Amino acid sequence: MQNMVILGATGSIGASTLSVISANPDAYRVYALVANASVDKMLALCVTHRPQVAHMVDSQAALALQAKLPPELNIQVTSGEDELIALVTATEVDTVMAAIVGAAGLVPTLAAVKAGKRVLLANKEALVMSGELFIEATKASGATLLPVDSEHNAIFQCLPEEVQANLGRCDLAASGISHILLTGSGGPFLTAELASLASMTPAQACKHPNWSMGPKISVDSATMMNKGLEFIEARWLFNTQKDQLKVVIHPQSVIHSMVQYRDGSVIAQMGNPDMRTPIAHCMSYPQRIRSGVEPLDFFKVGQLSFCEPDFNRFPCLALAIAACAQGQEATTVLNAANEIAVEAFLQGQIGFTHIAKVNEACLSSVPKRAMTSIDDIIALDAQTRIYAREQLAKFA
């Protein structure tokens, strides 16, 4: 029986994780649920899953949850960063699902890694912001790191065991790997007229053709910044060198990524676009459990198509690839800028095409400095957010 902490319990990954746990009740126990401020959602989850601890990042939300929880459930409600770190590092905890969206997930995820936990990584920003520090912490603590993102999980499944066992430190070429093919659907605007992108609304951007996701990730998919962040994450997870990582547009989202070997072989991982599949894989690795996902029906799949990304249509993807080549400081800046820009777009403050412009302005103007600690990363993140908010006024 694995005791699990779910960071981001009220989000889409949290919901999928709890669904997999419910399908395998003899193997997993919800030790703690963590959310930001969604009191009613957390209350419902507590009643259903009976965790030992419910943690709310927002202190007022914690008080509201405490007042609403039936006392007979005997659930401890906590709040505060120190309490959260204590929770993910507790000796009772075996596995941490790291699914808090954005930079907010970095500190608790890194704490779980340093404590040597089995970390299921759905928070791509942790590696985007602190890749080298994160990988070194994993190595030092002996933590088990398993990628939840459908693409990275697909790549992981297509790799040899010696690479799987050495994430972040592997040598792809020595294992006969030519390159990794990171697939992406292209989002809802893949075939839209370029001239129409400036007028696209948040509702349109959030209508992904294949996946069910939260608003921030949905917008990132529409700009393909999501694929850009995944590109950066893959660079750290799989220790890719120049030209070992390529992005391929695959609109059907049936092939979740591929690995091409030196002998010309290509191994692909396929399945219905449902996050419960990679979540179940990570939870049970190296075994297999029920995910609740229907098996892929090849007679209904139809045509599978592929194309190169159009960087005129997806400038955010180009920015992410360029930032990855520049290094850790640039990717930290880009991530912070993008979070501010996407939130502004979702609130109707800027247009869809302004997201890339805010990102580009920050990437070119925010001073980069060497980062040797988590405090350095947080400081650069904060500095970038201030500059990004200043840029918003230019596009309002």
Curated annotation (Swiss-Prot):
Keywords: Isoprene biosynthesis, Manganese, Metal-binding, NADP, Oxidoreductase. 1-deoxy-D-xylulose 5-phosphate binds at K124, S150, E151, S185, H208, S221, N226, K227, E230. GO terms for biological process: isopentenyl diphosphate biosynthetic process, methylerythritol 4-phosphate pathway involved in terpenoid biosynthetic process. InterPro entries: DXP_reductoisomerase, DXP_reductoisomerase_C, DXP_reductoisomerase_N, DXPR_C, DXPR_C_sf, NAD(P)-bd_dom_sf. It catalyses: 2-C-methyl-D-erythritol 4-phosphate + NADP(+) = 1-deoxy-D-xylulose 5-phosphate + NADPH + H(+). Mn(2+) binds at D149, E151, E230. Disulfide bonds: none annotated. Coiled coil: none annotated. Pfam families: DXP_redisom_C, DXP_reductoisom, DXPR_C. Pathway: Isoprenoid biosynthesis; isopentenyl diphosphate biosynthesis via DXP pathway; isopentenyl diphosphate from 1-deoxy-D-xylulose 5-phosphate: step 1/6. It is an enzyme of class 1 (oxidoreductase). Belongs to the DXR family. NCBIfam families: Dxr, PRK05447.1-1, PRK12464.1. PANTHER family: 1-DEOXY-D-XYLULOSE 5-PHOSPHATE REDUCTOISOMERASE, 1-DEOXY-D-XYLULOSE 5-PHOSPHATE REDUCTOISOMERASE, CHLOROPLASTIC. This is 1-deoxy-D-xylulose 5-phosphate reductoisomerase. It comes from Shewanella sp. (strain ANA-3). The gene is dxr.
